[in-house]
Amino acid sequence: MHSWFKTCDGLAASLPVTLKRNSVVLTLTILLLSVPAHPQSVPNSPTSANDLARRVVTNELTFQDDHTNWMYRLEKEQYGKKQVEEIVETKEGSLSRLLSINDQPLTAKQQLEEDQRVRELMTSRSAQQKLRRARDAETLQGRRLFKMLPDAFVFSYAGDEGNLVKLSFRPNPSFRAPSLEARVFHDMEGEMWVDCKQERLAGFDGHLTQTVKFGFGLLGHLDKGGHFEVRQAEVVPGHWDMITLRLEMTGKALLFASIGVQKKENHQDFYRVSDDLTLVQAADILNRPLVVADNR
């Protein structure tokens, strides 16, 4: 049930702290979810680029209700620090376990800290509630951002690359962004890739066309040129998921504090787990990595 809606999280992280309503939101995840049971085919009749974008958005939102759970490996780099984690999705939220830092396995002390963190989540009702609230918040705001995609931009055909059709996009001058996050989103231009056979969103690559100011610049701003990139693929037959995230944003918060977000993520080694999996069962899986690896 992993979705690109977790991607908008990166955009949210680039906003001045005083302006963020949900630090866990924005996962522009702008895209995704799971698999079409009956994918729509592209009609033979000419279709405008905006109509194609709208159909893709409708499909992705429809497929969000997929409730399959997956285990996968996350490689991420932020502020010069590299981490590798194993993630297991459950009906109660996702559980992660840190495997390495800067290409080095965890020390004995770090292993104990990870054990304690996972154990605390298993026994703390408040921690579990916080996890569920974060999941619900990111899903809700991700849907809102994704839903406005066809209205926020003007699309045009820009060629094709293999099985993908490339659409270029620019801000729609008549669109009025309803939120700060939407303003950052709307002030981008770039390219979007669509798998026309299944009408799935395969990629989104945008950059800020101008400096985005908050509170007339008094509360902060994001610099022109900030870059956001997401890739999605059919990771196993019939299942689409996010595989790559890139985010680079700079700016100022409250006139003085610098904003510098550089984030990279790669998602790989997807493995189906039970749709009824609990957090306790996920913790057990994460403690048996060799067994899971043998099943891949």
What are these model-predicted stretches?
Residues 35-39:
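Sec/Tat signal peptide C-region and signal peptidase I cleavage site
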